[in-house]
Amino acid sequence: MAGRSDWDYTRNGPSTWVERFPMAAGSRQSPVNIETDRAESDHEALSSKPLRWKYPASASRKLVNPGYCWRIDCDGEGTLLTGGPLMDDIYKLEQYHCHWGCSDSRGSEHTVDGQAFAGELHLVHWNTTKYRTFAEAAKAPDGLAVLGVFLKVGKAHEEMDKIARMLPYVSHKDEMIEIDDPIDPSKLLPVRGGRAGRCINPCMRWADRIIRPDNKCGFQDDNGYWTYLGSLTTPPCNESVTWVLFKKYIEVSHHQLNIFRNLRKFPRGEECPCHENHGVVINNFRPPLPLGNRVLRECGSF
């Protein structure tokens, strides 16, 4: 993977990444703008192989500040993502992290009909059916799967608050802390078990009763998502990701986002690079790129 000195979101920002990482100029790059009127309905695939996941809270092991976001690393044991666009392949949770802006109006990487959100949570998985390691999977076109969740400012999110309370302990780059109070990734999803917001499209109709526990495989969701083939949104921008973006968002508070914005992009003891947003981690999102001739599918009822 690339060294952090090779890229950032300011002087060495997204518009320059292609100079060091040629894959960033590929035709399967992420994020994209979700044009809802362009999405192809795929209700049959959803009903035949629903998207399913299982996330034991014990899998979340440590909170890390890599200098450009907060990230929770997982051991993957007992985790599972399958179904939907992933078909029968089994994916394991590797880590999850977040993107946000300097204000509550913009911070997501993907947009929906041009609308940005306050932030975007990414749960990154790798294909254990076909590949032996995350590194191997990251080089394959079907190696990774990322669940994307939009964040909107509203009420404080209880599970997200566990993360926010720990962030002062990893305030500077390269700091990390073991997680003592278990964090359940499934409670960060906009389905039953987490705090769900409204639908992004106000014309959509939803019913929590159709989201039900599945005894064999955690939760399964009929509640709606968009999916397309894309890439990692950070260098080296490998084109290895099947994206699943939930149509619902979760609410987080303004205070919680402000705690995110207090993270520092430089190590403790080093001089603050004050030419770069006073050294704080903000606007850590890549702008949307063309979808091109890729197929955007939607699963879920309107």
Give the positions of each predicted feature.
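Alpha-carbonic anhydrase
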Residues: M1-F302
